[in-house]
Regions:
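N-terminal beta1-alpha1 cap of cysteine-dependent amidohydrolase-like domains
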Residues: 1-73, 81, 87, 92-94, ...
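A generic "binding-loop/recognition-motif" signal
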Residues: 74, 112
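An acidic, glycine-rich "communication" segment
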Residues: 88-110
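Conserved hydrophobic/aromatic beta-strand scaffold that supports enzyme active sites
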Residues: 98, 134-136, 144
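Active-site-proximal beta-strand elements of phosphoester/diester hydrolases
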Residues: 107-108, 143-148
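Substrate-binding strand-loop-helix patch
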Residues: 109, 115-118
């Protein structure tokens, strides 16, 4: 396992100021949450220290009602923290597959072997895969996306999450 940011995020978030949070417990998460407009929990390995840092900052952001968007690993982390259910999924490792977004078929990528089976009680499902697993969800200022938009030739996120993540003048 390694700890690094996917290079696709640089181009995907072009024009936005990026601040990378080190996996260090000796930092002021409350101050970080005060200074950040949003927190994106990117994909990657589920390393204990990383998970602890992300959980502390996500909690501080939630206290301030600021956007927290989880991508892949981040979506699973938020789902778990909020009481959703994660299950093993076959046939999703390193391939494209369809998701349903309010009756519209979208093609997304997949790099995992787990999925979201049930969402916490206040979340709204935005996209599901062909087996009914939840691929994206939103709950106020919190959102999860199982695929990697930063690894797509034409990145796509549901409109609700695009608005949450990229809205101006927060």
């Amino acid at each position: 396992m390694y700890d690094a940011i996917e290079h696709g995020w640089y181009s995907y978030l072009n024009g936005h100021t990026l601040f990378f949070i080190p996996n260090n417990l000796d930092q002021d998460f409350q101050h970080l949450a005060d200074t950040l407009d949003a927190f994106v929990i990117t994909g990657g390995d589920d390393i204990a220290l990383r998970r602890t840092v992300e959980t502390k900052l996500a909690s501080a952001m939630m206290q301030r009602n600021k956007p927290v968007v989880g991508i892949c690993h981040g979506a699973f982390l938020l789902t778990d923290l909020l009481g959703g259910t994660i299950v093993d999924v076959d046939l999703h490792m390193e391939q494209l597959h369809p998701v349903m977004y309010f009756g519209e078929v979208k093609i997304v990528n997949s790099f995992h072997n787990i999925g979201i089976d049930k969402l916490h009680s206040t979340g709204t499902v935005l996209c599901t895969d062909e087996l009914g697993h939840i691929e994206s969800w939103i709950d106020g200022t919190l959102a999860g996306v199982v695929w990697h938009p930063e690894r797509m030739d034409q990145p796509w996120l549901p409109d609700e999450i695009e608005t949450l993540l990229f809205k101006e003048n927060k």
